[in-house]
Swiss-Prot record:
Classification lineage: Bacteria, Pseudomonadati, Pseudomonadota, Gammaproteobacteria, Enterobacterales
Xref: InterPro entries: 6-PGluconate_DH-like_C_sf, 6PGD_dom2, 6PGDH_C, 6PGDH_Gnd/GntZ, 6PGDH_NADP-bd, 6PGdom_BS, NAD(P)-bd_dom_sf, Pgluconate_DH
UniProt key word Oxidoreductase: yes
Keyword NADP among record annotations: yes
Organism: Shigella flexneri
Name of the protein in question: 6-phosphogluconate dehydrogenase, decarboxylating
Amino acid sequence: MSKQQIGVVGMAVMGRNLALNIESRGYTVSIFNRSREKTEEVIAENPGKKLAPYYTVKEFVESLETPRRILLMVKAGAGTDAAIDSLKPYLDKGDIIIDGGNTFFQDTIRRNRELSAEGFNFIGTGVSGGEEGALKGPSIMPGGQKEAYELVAPILTKIAAVAEDGEPCVTYIGADGAGHYVKMVHNGIEYGDMQLIAEAYSLLKGGLNLSNEELAQTFTEWNNGELSSYLIDITKDIFTKKDEDGNYLVDVILDEAANKGTGKWTSQSALDLGEPLSLITESVFARYISSLKDQRVAASKVLSGPQAQSAGDKAEFIEKVRSALYLGKIVSYAQGFSQLRAASEEYNWDLNYGEIAKIFRAGCIIRAQFLQKITDAYAENPQIANLLLAPYFKQIADDYQQALRDVVAYAVQNGIPVPTFAAAVAYYDSYRAAVLPANLIQAQRDYFGAHTYKRIDKEGVFHTEWLD
């Protein structure tokens, strides 16, 4: 009996849809799930597909041609380790395990090291695009042994999303945990994008009292210009969706934003690397404070503050918010790609930032027209320290920073919280400052802890007895 070309473990929605995607590209696929019912359900719902169900790990592994290619789509963490442990007794040296889950990159580094020592290949692969992307074409970020990637590249290339220029949204990212790291930063950028959009929405509601229909029209217009992106596109649809009672759905959704922890991972890594990922970190904190609903309701009855006044001319303020949103987005990506650079140096990954931006252009949640500008910036100068220094982004900062400053000033004066817009201004001004007040902090540290300091007029390291 002929062997199957690839196996998929895990038949929850992402695993199921990726298996169907692979099958639709002409590959034969073995499927396995820990619970028999899920596998039977997939087969029953997809008659005529070249999906071969197996109900024991041994039979599943033995059904695959060698070197075996096995895609894991199981719950990250202990579930991934358990799945790997169940496979290992039946694998041969040179077989390839692909982890497509939302896995913490340090776990991927560990698994890659452990499996390599046993003669197996391990490819930690970020997959973005949600359920629809998994089925129709996601953005794929594989990392691991380059030679093993070459053996799975034809399949990954066929199932990936395709950008407008015909390029598949997949590329080899780098060694061990590089793929999952890039996916993690992608998710952090996603947090930043979503919070910036939410703050723009809050400003337009608070400053202009725009109706849902007006908001939808505004976002439709924005989506036809520089802000063209998946998130802007879906947001315009959200504003006009009504429930069964005729209420605008967005207006009756509880204002507590959940999270799965990947934004937190991005911020934690930034702290480990000493990277000022302020905007994305504020977007994580914004979700946390949103979850304090009961406290916020109680505080709203006790803590005073200004009531929002009209922002003035409607068209003028909408344009200011649009410009502020675009520049805020640029700052967020500048921070994210700066962190990728720091991680690449720390973990010896040799990341290609332009290629990373290219694979974000379709299939994934942060897909946006302006990603081509990032690719262009790195093509012009692969070693650029920060995207804000690239000519296009510098020009946008020159043109739009006053709008961002005006919007933040209006928000502060009118009691509208805009943590990520404010973070964008603070980062921009800090990054362009030749001199910061950190000299005083160094003096304080030396005063209470003898931590020493450097001087601008002399070489060396100094300590002062401040009480003399």
